[in-house]
Amino acid sequence: MLLEKVRKTRENMEIVVDSGQETVEIDRSQYIGGSDIPIILGISGFTKPNKLAQLKNKVIPYENKKTLYTEFGHIFEPFIREVANKKFNMNTVPCCKTSEELGLRANCDGYDSENSLLLEVKTNNGEHEDKSDYIVQIHFYMAMYDVKKCILAEYGRTKEEEEIINVVV
């Protein structure tokens, strides 16, 4: 099974830590990453599994499109991480762990090696009740980083923030 292969090889996977200047971004078109897991399982509302397969196999061009929603998340993520670090007395930093052999990439929002835990930050419209897509992504990261704990920090955009985004979009 894939999980067994991850367990056997994860010690050899280098962890790339964010320098603090910008978010760690390992080429998303090359690897299967955490955000791909809900798509593969058919529980993503954004992309279908067959389209993901076409993208990863370069049948259709991969576009790393930035949207206002993703940009909002990138802007807020460091602030949310800072608040979570203080609240839970931890020191998470953005990291990426990649397995060339397995073609996997775990680009996590926060990893605290001392406390052996992860932080996953999500921003949404505040109406994301079914967390199954978040949970499968988190489980993937937990397997890649060999941790048993992850804190999900979720920020629901205010009505005013949603209105601004909708006007701009």
Question: Where would I find each of the regions flagged by the language model?
Answer:
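Charged, glycine-rich intrinsically disordered N-terminal tails and low-complexity linkers that flank
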Residues: 1-75, 79, 87
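Nucleic-acid nuclease catalytic cores
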Residues: 70, 87-169
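Short, well-ordered alpha-helical scaffold segments within catalytic/effector domains
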Residues: 77-81, 135-138
